[in-house]
Amino acid sequence: MNFLMSEEQSAIVDMASRLFADFCTDETIQQFWAGDEPYDRALWQALREGGLTALILPEDLGGSALGMTELCAVLESQGRRLAPAPLWPHQLAVAALAKFAEGAPGMAELADATRLATLSLEGLQQSRGLTLHARKTDAGWRLNGRAVAVPQAEQAALAVLPAQTAEGVRLFAVDPAQAGVERIGGRLTHHEPAADLVINDLELPTAAALGEQALDWLGPRVAACLGALQLGVSGEALKRAVAYTSERVQFGQPIAAFQAISQKTADCLIDVEALRSSLWQLVWRLDAGLDAAGAAGVVRAWTCDTGHRVTHAAQHMHGGVGVDVSYPIHRYTYWSRALEIACGGVTANLEALGRWLATPALTDADC
């Protein structure tokens, strides 16, 4: 079995890696964190011109109609450089609208990434319930409640939000700037802008509700994107820790030669490779059109666990340098924690995975 990327896939990853390397040095990322920009606009323009903002979008919208394999390979490169660009929430939101929404407004501009789309992770996490509710009306739907920490919500022209209905959770396309929506902005742990959307008696047409299968389609893909970013973040944090401990001399030898350090880095490598294996299993299942609920649960758990252990260890191995915020390693810890929180936490995900494993109808084909 050939696990290597195709020529086309390798070319996409190479282009993305070059762009992230050019725009996202340690110095430029430090400057970005010191500023107020929501994302790197020059990088976003370069990603648009390279077609990387439309990898999974259908061809009739100007996309490449590629799969999660290509997107996640690019996201791993993004994670390594901590690139400040809303690459995955924009693409998944637009792809979901294209697949499950009837005539969503402004799709051409969204597909071209001249206007941003985003999505809420509530309802896709395993750790808490929804605070946004939707009730059917004669004219369509009425929404009330709050969508918490929606990424880029103050910049987005359209947001895909999950809301609790009488029949279950449903996704809705909402313009965050319209009347009836209040945006309360802030920054997440890794400096990404986000906003709570407080919604009061927002009337939406029937077409604003995405198809009933949209949530099941979106959830595993969100897990894959978060896992790919975590793979890049954790892998690069480990790489930097290995480089530092190989150069840092104490008691006449590099500290990497000490048993405690070598064993800790070996444990970290096992964690990173476990995440890598589970991620590509999930991505393969998604692109093959197979059920991916169980694989997504495994990836969410590893995304939380791997990131927490690896970046904590990498920070620790840097010693006093690791707590100096002029040195870049702390930003990997912040990114890793943000991704862990976005996934809902390891405990909640392991509990959800246990419930899935206990499902009586589970067969070998589902694993």
Predicted regions and their residues:
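Alpha-helical interface subdomain recognition
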Residues: M1-R81, K136, G140-W141, P220-C367
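Short glycine/proline-enriched turns and hinge-like loops at secondary-structure junctions
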Residues: L66, R128, Q152-A156
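N-terminal glycine-rich flavin-associated loop
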Residues: P84-G103
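A short, Trp-centered hydrophobic/proline-enriched beta-strand micro-motif
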Residues: D112-L124
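Active-site-adjacent elements of ketosynthase-type condensing enzymes
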Residues: Q125-L132
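Generic beta-strand structural signal
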Residues: A134-T137, Q164
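A short core secondary-structure module
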Residues: N144-V181
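Flexible, small-/acidic-enriched active-site or ligand-binding loops
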Residues: A149-V150, D175-T206, Q213-A214
